[in-house]
Amino acid sequence: DLTVKKGDILLTKENADTTIGDQGYTLEIGDSITIKSTTYQGIFFGTRSVLQALVASGDALTINKGEARDYAKYEYRKFMLDVARKYMPMWYLKDFVKYASWYKFTDIQVHLNDTSYNGHSRFRLESDIPGLTATDGYYTKGEYRDFQYYAEDYGIRIVSEFDTPAHSAVFIDNNSELGFDGTHLDIRLNSDKKETVYKFIADLYEEYMGGENPVFVT
């Protein structure tokens, strides 16, 4: 049997409130602290509240006794990191995940391709397509896969984004047959290129989402 002692923090799904959604949680604070939720994410958000209360108490490192019932007003709380225009090393992305989790964000959209303000196009993932991957900073498939699992541990989902059919200069620079100008893929109704474009994009997604060990996992 589990015995909760003075000063313990118990994280549990047992007898959790099912009326406050997947992100909701309850706090019971006495000589010990109990955080209940129906999901891992809800429990994790509860731990952030406990940490925030401890930080707010200053050197005292104490929390007032009582009960709390917390749930999300907005289900999705997200923002975008434009790593295409401005490369951010993996250590920075992981630090940002921890920062975002403190404020109980749920999603981080990672913008993986675009045309930079200096006119240079970038694709920030390791790719099987020769010449597509940026040379001034990119993420290997393995480290990007691990990054998504890392974020998941902090209650955050990584939403990976390829920007098409506009903002697609990096694909056109790699294969000029894909575009009708410098930045737009040619999917016009009367274009004889559109089937080639569709296949290119489908193959690109298959590279990262297909197989037994996909790169995009969340």
Label each PLM-derived region with a short phrase.
Residues 1-73:
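Contiguous, structured surface segment used for ligand recognition
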